[in-house]
């Protein structure tokens, strides 16, 4: 090694030791994100909350003006306890074209769902409303079949990617419905895309459990629904923006 190289090496060592303090200053922790709120920007874009963390005023039971027993506010969330058969809850307002965002979590082997454009005209909400599956894939038998796994258009369209988080963790999901075009999003990824009323749609429905339901997926407007499937489930940060 030359004398010049030795000198440069010493300078670099000195610079490194002098520049680095004995201990890093304490970093301020980032504030936890506010739950069940909207930013000014979101309000300006047309978003509205479907749950403010304080009341269930925007939700009710099937063919009822009351929220059924078994649904409550817990952990800043809309929570179905699983202790009684309560039935699904639905938004008081109906939506046609929309962008829906929310978060959900379930326990091990938990099962629930999110329906849209659902009608009370028929015997059950699932007779008309397509469902985005809510599921612990690892713990529930439906997770073994892609068409019924988390994020799927239940029993019809499987998710293209496996991005669901493990039981007990929050998943960020979205449903975008614009005319016949529908997208399912989960944890930042678009995982399902389909066209209502298309030949592909008709073929899939005809080969499914929905084959005898003539209005399935064909309502132009309907309710957003959170499903009672007997298992505990939590929903929070529920917001929607109309696209029509």
Regions found by a protein language model. Name each.
Residues 6-16:
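Bacterial N-terminal signal peptides
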Residues 18-244:
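Carbohydrate-interacting regions of secretory-pathway proteins
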